[in-house]
Amino acid sequence: MHRNFRKWIFYVFLCFGVIYVKLGALSSVVALGANIICNKIPGLAPRQRAICQSRPDAIIVIGEGAQMGINECQYQFRYGRWNCSALGEKTVFGQELRVGSREAAFTYAITAAGVAHAVTAACSQGNLSNCGCDREKQGYYNQEEGWKWGGCSADIRYGIEFSRRFVDAREIKKNARRLMNLHNNEAGRKVLEERMKLECKCHGVSGSCTTKTCWTTLPKFREIGYILKEKYNAAVQVEVVRASRLRQPTFLKIKQIKSYQKPMETDLVYIEKSPNYCEEDASTGSVGTQGRLCNRTSPNADGCDMMCCGRGYNTHQYTKVWQCNCKFHWCCFVKCNTCSERTEVFTCK
């Protein structure tokens, strides 16, 4: 979502929060306000709009989670022809890729994980209603290992279920792309769930660790980004299996395998080969690489040869000037030299 638009939503809902505190309940006026705002957010499916209207506090967290996923996507692909950008309608989840490619698989997985991560964190911090710490991780004592649940364990199950309800609600059409998107959403959430951390604190006399109090915490989202990038590199091409009578897509199977072998839960899957992302193409959502910075000496994806797709590159020269070798003189002034450096940057034609 556009940064200014997100700030606008935040301030509007902040006003709702003030009204809520003053009145002690969400009045009909506030409900009407939430209805107006939720109808202004682009790209929401009907069920998503209904969640927005019933949980206006949650839509801010959802937007932050989706943005966290988009930011991580841009970081992971910052040196590639595709840098997590696309042509098309802007939504709370960014601009969607029209092709069911491995890039689309990554964007769906990372944003679904981002929403689950943000919702779980907001619950632990007391910033969302109807949720909090994981109640099931309280009071249990493991005598053999000498630890017990304590503190505030992150309720990852709530975050995942909320992400499932909201993110998956945009899949309306009953086609192969829907099955692909739902699988990748779930893969992103599953990776997050599997990387939850157990943190413990020791208790005992004179620094001994007679017993430990433990709780679960969320992993750094950068870790999830790296794992999903690896799964992107190993993404599995699938095809749809249709029901014999209605011919509707039923489930996905790995392509080019005769048996009905399904992909693994945490596999990223795609149904169409990726475009080369060299040129701007509205039909695929590719923005092309014209004007992108490139590295003239690199043989990798960020190198001008690969990034510019053989079109060549432009050289830009500029001089950077700054104060250097500063010395303090008694008394009392600082004297500096002026240093300069000539720099070249290269952009794709």
Curated annotation (Swiss-Prot):
Sorted UniProt keywords: Developmental protein, Disulfide bond, Extracellular matrix, Glycoprotein, Lipoprotein, Secreted, Signal, Wnt signaling pathway
Gene3D superfamilies: 3.30.2460.20
Region (Disordered linker): 238-266
Cleaved signal peptide residues: 1-24
Disulphide connectivity of cysteines: C73-C84, C123-C131, C133-C152, C200-C214, C202-C209, C278-C309, C294-C304, C308-C348, C324-C339, C326-C336, C331-C332
Compartments, as annotated in UniProt: Secreted, Extracellular space, Extracellular matrix; Secreted
Major site of localization recorded for this protein: secreted
Lipid-bearing positions (O-palmitoleoyl serine): S206
GO terms of molecular function: cytokine activity; frizzled binding
Tissue specificity as recorded in UniProt: Expressed in differentiating lens fiber cells.
Gene Ontology biological-process annotations: canonical Wnt signaling pathway; cell fate commitment; cellular response to retinoic acid; fibroblast proliferation; forebrain regionalization; lens fiber cell development; neuron differentiation; positive regulation of JNK cascade
Record note on modification: Palmitoleoylation is required for efficient binding to frizzled receptors. Depalmitoleoylation leads to Wnt signaling pathway inhibition.
Residue spans crossing the bilayer: none
Record bears the keyword Ion transport: no
Chain positions carrying an annotated carbohydrate: N83, N127, N295
GO cellular component, one term: extracellular space
Function: Ligand for members of the frizzled family of seven transmembrane receptors that functions in the canonical Wnt/beta-catenin signaling pathway. Required for normal fusion of the chorion and the allantois during placenta development. Required for central nervous system (CNS) angiogenesis and blood-brain barrier regulation.
Protein family membership: Belongs to the Wnt family.
Name recorded for this polypeptide: Protein Wnt-7b
The organism of origin for this protein: Gallus gallus
Gene that encodes it: WNT7B
